[in-house]
Amino acid sequence: VNARVGKWSLNGAVSGTFTPRDKGEMNSNREYGTVGNKFVSQSLYDTDSKYGNGRVGAIFEIDSLNSVGAEIEYINQASDGTSWSQTDLVKNSYPMKSTGNYRQKDDYNTFSATVNYLRKMDERGSIFKVIADFVNKRSTGDNLHTIRYEQSNWSRDTVYRSHAAADYDMATTDISFQKNLRKKMSLKIGAKYTYTLMDDHSLYEGLNSSGSWIPNEEYG
């Protein structure tokens, strides 16, 4: 959407993608030529994802030589999925079974803002500009895994989860001047400052026999 109201030029846009849930089933069966050997596997999955974007901006013409503008934008992308699998294996008439449940959730967000000032210096198109930008990005991911192994005389459970997050901030200021001397000849000077901050952290935990979550420092 674009609009002109007096000295204001306005623009905005919104978009989104919402996909149907992705569900599926996979089955595998292997036949052996010998008695007492078998392999059967089944998997189920269910995934949901979405994407959204919004942007709005404005430019104000102070006079014929000076103008200021600003724009902000937000983006979100997320997915959430579960899966289940079971495998039955018989080797030399000795049965073994494994069952797994998995959950994964991811979220990604971006916010950006821009402010600028422009001044036309002469009729040749010489211009003085000041532009300031800020971008914030944040992503998170969570996983939960439950696995069970079974044989004829024993069984074992494994449960673990993880959380990962990343934060990223960047701010820039750009000041420039372009002097058009004559056709196809110009002089450009300027300065730019950039500030960056990054924070990445993750946590991996396993569930012990008493029901407590124990951090795994080797992966964290």
Q: Positions of the model-derived regions?
A:
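Outer-membrane beta-barrel translocator domains and adjoining extracellular loop/strand segments
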Residues: 23-36, 81-96, 140-149, 154, ...
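Membrane-proximal, glycine/serine-rich, low-complexity loop/turn segments characteristic
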Residues: 1-84, 102-140, 171, 176-196
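Extracellular loop and loop/strand-boundary signature of outer-membrane beta-barrel proteins
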Residues: 39-44, 96-103, 157-163, 211-220
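Outer-membrane beta-barrel transmembrane domain signature of Gram-negative proteins
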Residues: 160-220
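Short linear motifs at secondary-structure transitions and domain/linker junctions
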Residues: 43-45, 91, 104-108, 151-153, ...
